[in-house]
């Protein structure tokens, strides 16, 4: 598997592929990409020994880190809902689909093999006007 970048921040060590699709116009749009958390990722340590799964907060951080690739100053202000349907296990490929609505509303779904593993509704700051593209 070719890995094009390593995400920084809390999700350090996760491998994020280039966006499959990114359609952002002003403050709305969508981003779809893939991520992979190797078995050695620190998120799996202690959660749970012998039965590793990615902690729920890292599902949220993954979405935020992907958004930060498109908007410089994205910060989480509220978790409206977070539904964890199935665990993300070590070495699984995770499809991440993010929809950006007006006034900071974010809807995200994480999937493994086409099956939803988490559904998130977040409120963020830092998405005002056109995106500040990072180089």
Question: What do these predicted regions represent?
Answer:
Residues 4-14, 26-29, 84, 88, ...:
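A glycine-rich (often HGG/GG-containing) alpha/beta subdomain
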Residues 63-99, 107, 123, 127:
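Hydrophobic beta-strand-centered segment that forms part of the acyl-chain substrate-binding groove
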Residues 37, 41, 88, 100:
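A broadly conserved detector of short glycine/acidic/proline-rich loop/turn motifs that flank catalytic sites
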Residues 53-66:
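Active-site beta-strand/loop microenvironment that shapes enzyme catalytic pockets
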Residues 19-22, 28, 99-135:
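HotDog/MaoC-like acyl-thioester-processing domains
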Residues 9-54:
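Catalytic strand-loop segment that frames the active site of acyl-thioester-processing enzymes
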Residues 2-3, 77:
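Long, low-complexity, compositionally biased intrinsically disordered regions
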């Amino acid at each position: 598997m070719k890995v094009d970048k390593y995400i920084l921040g809390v999700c350090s060590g996760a491998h994020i592929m280039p966006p499959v699709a990114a359609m952002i116009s002003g403050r709305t749009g969508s981003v779809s990409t893939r991520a992979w958390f190797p078995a050695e990722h620190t998120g799996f340590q202690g959660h749970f020994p012998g039965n590793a799964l990615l902690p729920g907060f890292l599902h949220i951080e993954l979405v935020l880190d992907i958004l930060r690739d498109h908007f410089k100053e994205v910060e989480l202000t509220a978790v409206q809902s977070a539904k964890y349907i199935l665990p993300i296990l070590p070495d699984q490929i995770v499809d991440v689909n993010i929809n950006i609505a007006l006034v900071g509303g974010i809807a995200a779904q994480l999937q493994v093999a086409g099956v939803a593993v988490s559904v998130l509704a977040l409120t963020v700051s830092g998405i005002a006007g056109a995106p500040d593209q990072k180089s």
